[in-house]
């Protein structure tokens, strides 16, 4: 079964926890995915790289230093070595012992929580090995049906889609294009992940008409406040776009804040679904 990323199919916007619910739990961990679900998210975005033994692990940085008690490149460590690291204590002592998950483990949790998952390719060194490893992880059609592979590198997305039947891909863009549909079609993309800074309602309508879904990122609440002070006026414009059905998925680091904002904007509540972290 393939799970839709389109508002027209789901009937309500997907709330997406960026790296999980990363303002309340350590990013890119199973705890962060559970925390996103608990606050009403039906989607999460995670980042992935390769280990030394060519296993795909969920990690944003190429180095382990920032989010674990380990040092050096993830690609220099075996999966067993990576699994021995503490990926939670840096965030809060309550998460001591949290481990870096594999992509397969993250997808399994998405099945259990009935979520979809946007998987960013962060691998830079050995994309051939990454593609091969990904094909193994996504060998089951049910797993592919919950996944959208995303990247800034649209060429990589086109390549990986050609190798894995039925795989959906989303290109991340930080610029405004004169013809975003052409940009998406050039790399056979199913989704564009568009910065709010460059969001254009007419482009969104054209993308939807072409069958391409749209994800936008709402940043952290403090960044949102700073944007308002700078005159970007997202508080007024984003609710209009949400009510008009122009955005299929809205992601953010604080899922409860995101849920409250979307609920207030659209009149559709997103109540918590489970135990909150903290």
Predicted regions and their residues:
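Phosphate-group recognition and catalysis centered on beta-loop-alpha active-site segments
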Residues: 1-278
């Amino acid at each position: 079964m393939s799970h839709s990323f389109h508002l027209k199919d789901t009937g309500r916007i997907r709330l997406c926890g960026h790296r999980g619910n990363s303002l309340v739990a350590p990013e890119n961990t199973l705890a962060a995915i559970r925390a996103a679900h608990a606050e009403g998210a039906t989607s999460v975005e995670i980042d992935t790289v390769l280990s030394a033994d060519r296993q795909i692990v969920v990690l944003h940085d190429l180095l382990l230093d920032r989010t674990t008690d380990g040092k050096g490149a993830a690609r220099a460590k075996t999966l067993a070595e990576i699994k021995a690291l503490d990926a939670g204590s840096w965030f809060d002592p309550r998460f001591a012992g949290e481990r870096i998950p594999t992509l397969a483990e993250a997808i399994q949790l998405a099945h259990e929580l009935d979520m979809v998952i946007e998987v960013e390719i962060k691998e830079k060194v050995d994309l051939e090995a990454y593609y091969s490893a990904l094909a193994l992880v996504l060998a089951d059609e049910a797993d592919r049906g919950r996944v959208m592979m995303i990247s800034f590198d649209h060429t990589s997305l086109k390549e990986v889609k050609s190798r894995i039947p039925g795989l959906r891909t989303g290109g991340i863009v930080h610029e405004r294009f004169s013809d975003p549909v052409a940009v998406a079609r050039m790399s056979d993309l199913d989704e564009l992940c568009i910065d709010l800074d460059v969001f254009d309602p007419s482009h969104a309508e054209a993308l939807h008409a072409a069958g391409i879904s749209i994800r936008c990122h709402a940043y952290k609440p403090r960044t949102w406040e700073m944007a308002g002070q700078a005159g970007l006026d997202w508080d007024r414009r984003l609710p209009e776009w949400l009510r008009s059905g122009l955005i299929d998925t809205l992601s953010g680091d604080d899922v409860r804040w995101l849920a409250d904002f979307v609920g207030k904007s659209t009149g559709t509540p997103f109540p918590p679904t489970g135990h909150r972290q903290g």
